[in-house]
C-alpha cells in the first residue's frame, strides 16, 4: 500500500545524529477487538479468561464444510467506529482471504479485507502539551482505512520443555484494523495518538480498550530520513500492547536505524519485536509484501452491502465524543484546556464530573474531581467505577462549602472520612463538630491573640501586605480550620488597617 507523506519537516522533532539531523516517521496499524458477545463468523463466545479451547466452534477450528456467517453487530460496530473517526463509510466492501501458515491459524488463511475495506479515510486529532507557556498544539493524524478481520489463536510455548500448545479461544474474534497515515513525527505524538484512539473507541463502546487483555495491539511502523527527503525504509514492530512500550520501542528503533545509516549500512524492511525487559527491538523476519499473502475474495462470503439510511441511523445514535465534550467543558463551564483534557481521559471520569457539576460551579467541581478524587484513586490504586465517594456525596460536600456550613479545609477532612468510613455527611459534620465558625467575636479573639504574640509581624504588615495571608493561616490553624476564611481575611485586614 503506497503511503503519501504530506507533513512538512518540523525542527522541533529532529533527532541529532553524528552526521547531522534526522527525522523519524511513524505510522501505526492498531488491532482493536470489537465489543461483541460472539465472534465475527461464528456464535462462539468472546469472553476473556476462559479455559483454553473452551470458546471454539467448528468454524473457528476450521472443520471441513463449516461456512462462515457474518455477525451483523460487528458490522455495526465497525461503522460506528468509522463515523467516530470522521471517516468515509464504504457502502460496499469485500472479505478477502489472506494466505499464510501458522499453527494457531487452523484455516491456513485469515479472513480480512484488502482491496475494499468497510471504512476509508478519516482523521484523529491529538493534543500535544502543555508547553512551557501552558499552550497545547493540535495535530491531525490521518486514517488511511479501517477494515474487518478475524483474530488468530494463541501459541503457548512456556508450558512444556519440548512442546508448544495452541489455544483457539481467540480464533475468529472480530478485529478492526485501523491503519494510520505516516503522520507522526515523535514517540510523544505516537503515544498521544494511541491514547486518543483508545479513548474514542471506549466512548463509542466499540472496543473496551483493555490493552492488558490484548483488546488493543499496535503494529508500529518506524523509518528515519534526512529532513525533507523521501520516506525511508520502514521496519514494523509487531504487537506492542502498552502505550509506554510503544514510546520506548519508537525511541530505540529510531536510534538503531540512524546508527545503521550513519555507519554506511542500509535498513532492511524487517518485522521486529520489542523486548520490554531489555528495552530494545530485535529482528524476527524480513517484512512480507502484499503479494506474499496472495489475497483473493473469499468465495464463501458475499460482498458486504448496505445503504446510506443504515449508516445514517447508526450516526444518529452515536454518543457524544471526547472532543465535543471537551469543547463543551471549556465553552460552557469555563474550564481550562488542561482541566478539560484530564476530565475526558476516561468516559467514566467525564460522566462522574458531569453528574457532580449539574447545577454547581463547574470550575469548583473540576478542582475537586481532578485534585481530590483522582488523587485518592491513584493513591489507593482504585478505578473510578469503584470509588467510595459517589457523585452525590462529592456534590453534597461542595454544597456544604457553598452554604458556609464547612470550610474548604474541613471539606477535605470530610472527603477523607467518607472515603474510608462512609456515612451521612450532615450527620458527620454535626456529630464531630466540623461546622464552620462564623461567630465574629470568637474569630476576633483568635486574631487578637495571634497579633499580640507576633508584634514584629504586625509592624511589618503595612510594608509587606503578603503577611495578611500568614495571619489568616495562623487563625485557621488556631481554629482547627473551622473559621470562615473570608471573615478571617476581612478582620485581619481591618486590624492591620490594610485596605
From Swiss-Prot:
Reactions listed under catalytic activity: L-glutamyl-tRNA(Gln) + L-glutamine + ATP + H2O = L-glutaminyl-tRNA(Gln) + L-glutamate + ADP + phosphate + H(+); L-aspartyl-tRNA(Asn) + L-glutamine + ATP + H2O = L-asparaginyl-tRNA(Asn) + L-glutamate + ADP + phosphate + 2 H(+)
Provide the E.C. number(s) assigned to this enzyme: 6.3.5.-
Top-rank lineage group of the source organism: Bacteria
Q: Which GO terms describe its molecular function?
A: asparaginyl-tRNA synthase (glutamine-hydrolyzing) activity; ATP binding; glutaminyl-tRNA synthase (glutamine-hydrolyzing) activity
Q: Name one Pfam family in it.
A: GatB_Yqey
Asked whether the UniProt record includes Transit peptide among its keywords, one would answer: no
The UniProt keyword set, sorted, is: ATP-binding, Ligase, Nucleotide-binding, Protein biosynthesis
> Which GO terms are recorded in the biological process aspect for this UniProt protein?
glutaminyl-tRNAGln biosynthesis via transamidation; translation
Q: What class of enzyme is it?
A: ligase
* Assembly and oligomerization: Heterotrimer of A, B and C subunits.
Q: What does this protein do?
A: Allows the formation of correctly charged Asn-tRNA(Asn) or Gln-tRNA(Gln) through the transamidation of misacylated Asp-tRNA(Asn) or Glu-tRNA(Gln) in organisms which lack either or both of asparaginyl-tRNA or glutaminyl-tRNA synthetases. The reaction takes place in the presence of glutamine and ATP through an activated phospho-Asp-tRNA(Asn) or phospho-Glu-tRNA(Gln).
**Identification of the protein by name:** Aspartyl/glutamyl-tRNA(Asn/Gln) amidotransferase subunit B
Q: Which gene encodes it?
A: gatB
Amino acid at each position: 500500500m503506497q503511503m503519501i507523506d504530506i507533513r512538512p519537516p518540523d525542527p522541533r522533532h529532529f533527532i541529532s545524529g553524528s552526521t547531522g539531523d534526522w527525522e523519524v516517521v511513524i505510522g501505526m496499524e492498531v488491532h482493536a477487538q470489537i465489543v461483541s458477545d460472539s465472534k465475527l463468523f461464528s456464535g462462539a463466545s468472546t469472553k476473556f479468561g476462559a479455559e483454553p479451547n473452551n470458546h471454539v466452534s467448528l468454524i473457528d477450528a476450521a472443520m471441513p464444510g463449516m461456512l462462515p456467517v457474518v455477525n451483523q453487530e460487528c458490522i455495526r460496530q465497525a461503522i460506528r467506529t468509522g463515523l467516530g473517526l470522521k471517516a468515509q463509510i464504504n457502502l460496499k466492501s469485500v472479505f478477502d482471504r489472506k494466505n499464510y501458515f501458522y499453527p494457531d491459524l487452523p484455516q491456513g488463511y485469515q479472513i480480512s479485507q484488502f482491496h475494499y475495506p468497510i471504512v476509508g479515510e478519516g482523521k484523529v486529532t491529538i493534543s500535544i502539551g502543555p508547553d512551557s507557556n501552558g499552550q497545547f498544539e493540535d495535530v491531525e493524524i490521518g486514517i488511511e482505512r479501517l477494515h474487518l478481520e478475524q483474530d488468530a489463536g494463541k501459541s503457548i510455548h512456556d508450558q512444556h520443555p519440548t512442546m508448544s500448545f495452541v489455544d483457539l479461544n481467540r480464533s475468529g474474534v472480530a478485529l478492526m484494523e485501523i491503519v494510520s497515515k505516516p503522520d507522526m513525527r515523535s514517540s510523544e505524538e505516537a503515544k498521544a495518538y494511541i491514547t486518543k484512539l483508545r479513548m474514542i473507541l471506549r466512548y463509542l463502546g466499540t472496543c473496551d480498550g483493555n490493552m492488558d487483555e490484548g483488546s488493543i495491539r499496535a503494529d508500529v511502523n518506524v523509518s528515519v530520513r534526512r529532513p525533507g527527503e523521501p520516506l525511508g525504509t520502514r521496519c514494523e514492530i509487531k504487537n506492542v500492547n502498552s502505550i509506554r512500550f510503544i514510546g520506548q520501542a519508537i525511541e530505540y528503533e529510531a536510534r538503531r536505524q540512524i546508527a545503521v545509516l550513519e555507519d554506511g549500512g542500509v535498513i532492511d524492511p524487517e518485522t521486529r519485536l520489542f523486548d520490554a525487559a531489555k528495552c530494545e527491538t530485535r529482528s524476527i523476519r524480513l517484512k512480507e509484501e502484499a503479494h506474499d499473502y496472495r489475497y483473493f475474495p473469499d468465495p464463501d462470503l458475499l460482498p458486504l452491502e448496505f445503504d446510506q439510511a443504515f449508516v445514517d441511523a447508526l450516526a444518529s445514535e452515536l454518543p457524544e465524543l471526547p472532543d465535543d465534550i471537551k469543547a463543551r467543558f471549556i465553552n460552557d463551564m469555563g474550564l481550562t484546556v488542561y482541566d478539560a483534557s484530564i476530565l475526558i481521559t476516561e468516559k467514566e471520569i467525564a460522566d462522574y464530573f458531569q453528574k457532580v457539576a449539574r447545577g454547581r460551579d463547574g470550575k469548583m467541581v473540576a478542582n475537586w474531581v481532578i485534585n481530590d478524587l483522582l488523587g485518592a484513586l491513584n493513591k489507593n490504586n482504585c478505578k473510578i467505577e469503584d470509588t467510595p465517594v459517589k457523585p452525590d456525596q462529592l456534590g453534597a460536600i461542595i454544597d456544604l462549602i457553598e452554604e458556609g456550613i464547612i470550610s474548604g479545609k474541613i471539606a477535605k477532612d470530610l472527603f477523607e472520612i467518607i472515603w474510608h468510613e462512609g456515612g451521612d455527611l450532615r450527620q458527620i459534620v454535626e456529630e464531630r463538630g466540623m461546622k464552620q465558625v462564623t461567630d465574629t467575636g470568637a474569630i476576633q479573639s483568635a486574631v487578637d491573640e495571634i497579633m499580640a504574640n507576633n508584634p514584629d509581624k504586625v509592624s511589618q504588615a503595612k510594608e509587606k501586605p503578603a503577611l495578611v495571608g500568614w495571619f489568616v493561616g495562623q487563625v485557621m490553624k488556631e481554629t482547627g480550620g473551622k473559621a470562615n476564611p473570608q471573615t478571617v481575611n476581612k478582620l485581619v485586614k481591618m486590624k492591620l488597617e490594610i485596605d
